[in-house]
């Protein structure tokens, strides 16, 4: 697996680009990806390690914001039935961020969103590829302030939906055991 710096001007017009999202600010990476999807109609983008994306702000404030958004649309009888569905998993949260930056009523925006894949960690089908280039977004474009407060999407997910997070964590541990040579 090879890594390269992602530059919007030098992206291929067609094909697939794999972006490692580890340690990047979620909103800034989402704008970068939305712009690339709109400008290059033949390009497919795959984002891996979505759980390691960073949201700025105090952890308590960010988690409370997510919990409030989820609870204000739910009902006691059926919490998932009323109102818009608020994503809880990091991959779906990030895809929803990118969707908000695309023109969803225009055909170009709908097509662009279909060309985006977001994964929590790195899926096995990507690891098994022989010639895989994982792109890193340049840190100058996604700068993080020192001494600022940050929280990863995995930590938010752990507090908003602990049962799903526990299940994912157990599955990750099993995969790691399986991948280790005996």
Curated annotation (Swiss-Prot):
GO biological process: negative regulation of translation; translation
GO molecular function: mRNA binding; structural constituent of ribosome
A GO term from the CC aspect: cytosolic large ribosomal subunit
CDD domains, per the entry: Ribosomal_L13
Task of the protein: This protein is one of the early assembly proteins of the 50S ribosomal subunit, although it is not seen to bind rRNA by itself. It is important during the early stages of 50S assembly.
Assembly notes: Part of the 50S ribosomal subunit.
Family: Belongs to the universal ribosomal protein uL13 family.
Protein name (record): Large ribosomal subunit protein uL13
Gene of this entry: rpl13
